[in-house]
């Protein structure tokens, strides 16, 4: 899980100045996080638009014989925040949803982020190097593979179904409850 990459406690173990041995300054970590979260809201709305478009295409029961641009515009309307550009249609070039193994599953990108952030929030609660949490993650998630339903595994680890709150905080879209 990439979430450790911007944790000061983790970075202090190895991210040091090669000459002085001084650990990476907290203000530099904050700048890295801010850069990572730049336009996070827009990026997320775009990902939702792509997922809506994907699901719309894969919900058609008969061969499509209509206007691709209009179909796409209608599918993505709930997440439209910028003016539509006439003549622009991304679907013909969106190989992820037709040839990339993500047919009707593009939403998986965002869902994976939700799972990772929510799971990591338990490490943040208990300490990012907490051996009990790490063991529970290994035991309940990693060691089970496909032997049980993924949601069952997740709930066994986390104690509840995935929540979006941790991802929203991670992206800087809501203030963290941490002090």
Where are these regions (language model features)?
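Cation-handling catalytic/transport regions enriched in His/Asp/Glu
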Residues: 1-179
